[in-house]
Design a protein with these regions (language model features):
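Hydrophobic N-terminal alpha-helices or hydrophobic patches in metabolic proteins across all domains
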Residues: 1-155
Length: 155
């Protein structure tokens, strides 16, 4: 593959993804505030590892710089339904006020945007680092008291 053409497409695709993600984060800022609020509750400690998970995800992306540089971003219009589905998931979760589903919808929206702009091959390389952020999402948060009781009874 021609590295000059790959660098040129990255010069277009990189800023495009960055702008789209910044717009997404500004539109869905309430979900981000909810997440960071949970991550900042150090006294509870259930999701205080969120910043660490985010840092590890960034590290995993940076570790793959050479692999990503060799790949050529190729937009994929077939991923647009995934953007729509993730947006609908977030919207439905917002309508019924289920913040956990909103955070999952936002994570899936980030993945769908990356897939749409960068294409299949680049998304395949970034799939694990993006989905790793899911460990910082409070999926088990509503079940924490029940799980704690079960653990206490077992011990």
């Amino acid at each position: 593959m021609n590295t000059a053409s790959s660098q040129y497409t990255w010069r277009l695709a990189g800023p495009a993804v960055a702008v789209l993600l910044l717009l997404t984060f500004s539109v869905y800022h309430e979900t981000l505030l909810y997440l960071t609020g949970l991550w900042n509750q150090l006294d509870i400690g259930e999701y205080a590892h969120g910043y660490l998970v985010l840092a590890i995800s960034v590290y995993l992306v940076l570790r793959q710089r050479r692999v990503l540089a060799a790949l050529r971003p190729c937009p994929n219009a077939w991923a647009l339904p995934a953007v729509l589905a993730a947006s609908l998931l977030w919207m439905l979760a917002a309508l019924v006020d289920v913040q956990v589903l909103q955070t999952i919808g936002l994570l899936l929206l980030v993945l769908a945007i990356v897939w749409t702009v960068l294409g299949n091959r680049v998304t395949r390389a970034l799939l694990f680092p993006i989905l790793f952020i899911g460990f910082a999402i409070p999926v088990w948060f509503p079940l924490s008291p029940l799980l704690q009781d079960l653990t206490a009874d077992a011990v």
